[in-house]
């Protein structure tokens, strides 16, 4: 049974749309979340034009304790201070834990929750549906159903997505499909739902141009290239093809380097760039990690980052 909530809380909720970065977590020398750097990151996110923010796999969410997750959610709502929508990842290895995370997110003032299926067991389709139904019915918030099988977990069948959408409607159930190949799978989900599904992409920017043309409602990149992704989204919205490809190419080249080492590759390069930008004091990641950035890759990232800065600075890229 869904929890009852006051109409005033529901009316204040902000919709998810546009550029919605997934925050990275700064850690101090004692491996604690550095809340001063986190606040700095959130302020920068909105200063460059993002529409909201959230947590996800690149937030190292599965490496946090339950208490850390709850405190992080509270801090993100506090630091955002009404400047945009806030959503958090609530996926867990059990339905009861996922539901508890979702309830905590609603109580903290989030606008939506997002969840992946359990990652340590391969579930039949009916169990996947039951898992998401449990989360959906535990809160009044919209639920983003995330298929992160391009890098972790199992794919979610389109039939399961259609069942959830039919049961709860498009305002309650949203989607972030990341199964490979992303573009064709995104279109297949769009078509299977008769165009009713609200769909977000999360490729880090490398597939944003293709996904945009297939009808997405927004993108959920990392924060490291956020100014570039905001400029790219604006260029796409304006139909500016020249700016679109000028910005997209260096973003795609950087993300291609990140993809070489899976989630650890993304985290290592993303945090390297956040330190380079002056947003984080440390590129520390929660251990254990399987890959670290080498000097030659870092130099190539630097070259591409300079090219991205040049592309963003051109007049065609900065028009909104």
PLM ranges: what are they?
Residues 84-85, 143, 172-173, 197, ...:
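Secondary-structure boundary/capping signal
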Residues 33, 40, 67, 71, ...:
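Conserved active-site and cofactor/substrate-binding residues in soluble primary-metabolism enzymes
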């Amino acid at each position: 049974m869904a929890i009852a909530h006051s109409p005033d809380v529901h009316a204040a909720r902000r919709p998810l749309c546009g550029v919605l970065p997934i925050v990275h977590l700064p850690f101090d020398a004692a491996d604690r979340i550095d809340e001063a750097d986190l606040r700095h990151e959130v302020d920068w996110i909105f200063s460059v034009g993002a529409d909201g923010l959230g947590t996800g796999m690149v937030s190292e969410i599965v490496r946090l304790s339950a208490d850390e997750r709850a405190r992080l959610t509270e801090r993100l709502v506090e630091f955002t201070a009404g400047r945009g929508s806030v959503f958090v990842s609530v996926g867990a290895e059990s339905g009861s834990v996922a539901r508890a995370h979702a309830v905590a997110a609603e109580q903290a003032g989030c606008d939506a929750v997002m969840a992946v299926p359990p990652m340590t067991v391969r579930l039949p389709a009916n169990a996947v549906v039951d898992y998401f139904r449990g989360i959906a019915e535990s809160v009044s918030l919209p639920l983003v159903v995330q298929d992160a099988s391009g890098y972790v977990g199992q794919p979610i069948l389109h039939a399961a997505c259609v069942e959830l959408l039919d049961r709860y409607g498009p305002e309650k159930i949203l989607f972030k499909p990341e199964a490979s190949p992303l573009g064709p799978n995104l279109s297949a989900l769009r078509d299977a739902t008769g165009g009713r599904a609200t769909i977000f992409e999360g490729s880090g920017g490398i597939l944003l141009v293709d996904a945009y043309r297939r009808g997405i409602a927004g993108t959920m990149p990392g924060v490291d290239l956020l100014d570039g992704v905001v400029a790219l989204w604006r260029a796409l919205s304006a139909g500016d093809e020249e700016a679109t490809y000028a910005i997209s190419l260096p973003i795609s080249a950087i993300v291609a380097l990140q993809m070489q080492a899976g989630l650890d590759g993304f985290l290592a390069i993303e945090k390297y760039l956040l330190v380079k930008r002056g947003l984080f004091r440390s590129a520390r990641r929660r251990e254990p990690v399987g890959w670290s950035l080498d000097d030659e890759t870092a130099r190539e990232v630097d070259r591409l980052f300079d090219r991205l800065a040049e592309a963003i600075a051109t007049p065609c890229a900065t028009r909104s």
